[in-house]
A protein has these predicted regions:
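A short, well-ordered alpha-helix in the C-terminal region of glycosyltransferases
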Residues: 380, 387, 394-409, 415-421, ...
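Glycosyltransferase donor-sugar binding loop
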Residues: 276-295
Length: 430
């Protein structure tokens, strides 16, 4: 089977779990003798293996933004489009968060969801023509429901099944103004009827999106994210220094402020003087001021030497990060549909301390490799850390259980086999 996986790129300026999810699935599907084509949208992809084989970036972020905002750009010569879609321009755009956050992009989100009725209809036709004439897939897999505007024309032109993953669309949509938020959910529900199946990354998020988009149960599948534990090395957690790790985009929404405040509370107790904090995951320009505030708080507490900020987050630096932390916490303010960093940590033998939000309890519960706390406050997080971070026996127990839990419930090869079965089911129905 030949699968075209359409994936929005983040540009590589921060740890993008959704991008890594798609990249890992592509490799696992190829191991199952499936032919997979990764088709990037908006920005270049963040992944460990840069193997796009010169597939062009469709819907270049700079190009479509200018055409959306300034009508004059809709009539520019082709060489201008090529320049705006060059890798150097797109990588520069990725450093500026306007392309990776919803505020200010509401109208473009609506236009993208409208597909052939939106302002990006030219880009849509270019993508469809390339899929039809060059890629020639048997099935198209959309990375998230914000891409549902592509489905109608793909099916009209190619008469093949289209499936759509569900992960964190609410994070993008719910920060919009009331008017745009309601409009986007309505269009997503309507356009969602045009795909053959939805695939949620967690039970939690399946229930959430079933309610929001009124998805029929027979069209909704659950396929947890997976990792290959062979890709990670396990350093015995009992031999590590007591270092708490954070790996995600370093921003307010991902709980960086909660993390720092909890660490300051923890360090008020002299019993935890050996504990350090290690932070990585990248950022965009939008995050700079907030990060500066956190560093100022740390400096005011005299803890600059206890907190290590690591700029590089792609492999091998990411593995080095996992080699040196004994515990992982990413206290996302409103939770997440999944959170791939949890599996990367567990596969490296690192226990989790996560808030009881989103799918975090689902991952912790199935893996048995961590603890959760509630509410998501600095005080509760510091208390949860205290119950584990200096307890070598407890850390070791959670480390062993977590690694086994990943192998049992979140193995990328098993999950990929399930994904192929979903493709086969929709292909028969289509």
């Amino acid at each position: 089977m030949k699968i075209a996986h359409i994936i929005p790129g983040s540009g590589g300026s921060f740890y993008c779990g959704n991008c890594l999810r798609d990249s890992k699935y592509m490799k696992a599907l190829q191991d199952l003798d499936q032919e997979v084509i990764k088709v990037p949208l908006y920005l270049p992809l963040f992944e460990d293996a840069h193997d796009l084989n010169e597939v062009p970036v469709f819907y270049g972020a700079v190009d479509i933004y200018l055409k959306q905002r300034f009508p004059v750009f809709r009539h520019m010569p082709a060489f201008v489009d090529r320049m705006l879609n060059s890798k150097s321009v797109l990588n520069l755009a990725a450093q500026n968060a306007g392309s990776t956050r919803a505020k200010g992009l509401e109208e473009m989100t609506v236009s993208m969801l409208l597909g052939e009725e939106g302002l990006q209809k030219g880009e849509l036709e270019r993508l469809v023509e390339w899929l039809r004439d060059e890629a020639k897939p048997d099935v198209v897999h959309l990375s998230n429901a914000l891409l549902l505007g592509l489905a109608r024309r793909i099916k009209q032109e190619m008469n093949i099944p289209v499936v759509c993953s569900l992960q964190d669309e609410d994070v993008w949509v719910d920060v919009m103004s009331d008017k745009h938020r309601e409009e986007v959910w309505q269009i997503m529900e309507a356009r969602g009827r045009e795909v053959d199946a939805f695939i949620s990354v967690s039970d939690f998020y399946a229930k959430e999106m079933k309610k929001r988009m009124h998805i029929r149960p027979d069209r909704l599948f659950i396929n947890h994210i997976g990792v290959d534990t062979a890709d990670y090395q396990v350093k015995p957690v009992q031999d590590k220094e007591p270092v708490i790790g954070f790996i995600s985009r370093m921003c307010e929404e991902n709980g960086l402020g909660v993390l720092v405040d909890a660490f300051l509370l923890l360090k008020e107790d002299e019993a935890y003087s050996p504990v350090k904090l290690k932070i990585t995951g990248g950022k965009t320009n939008d995050d700079t001021a907030f990060i500066k505030q956190q560093k100022k708080k740390i400096a005011s507490a005299g803890l600059e030497e206890q907190v290590l900020w690591v700029e590089e987050f792609e492999n091998p630096s990411r593995q080095n990060f996992f080699d040196t932390v004994a515990l992982l916490t990413v206290p996302v303010l409103n939770g997440e549909a999944f959170g791939l960093y949890q599996l990367e940590a567990l596969a490296s033998g690192i226990p989790l301390v996560q808030p009881e939000l989103g799918a975090f309890p689902e991952v912790v519960g199935l893996s048995e490799g961590g603890v959760t706390y509630h509410p998501n406050s600095p005080k509760k997080l510091a208390k949860a850390w205290k119950s584990i971070i200096l307890d070598k026996e407890k850390l070791t127990e959670l480390s062993v259980k977590g690694l086994e839990g990943v192998k049992t419930h979140f193995d990328i090869h098993k999950q990929s086999e399930k994904l192929v079965e979903i493709y086969k089911k929709v292909a028969v129905k289509a």
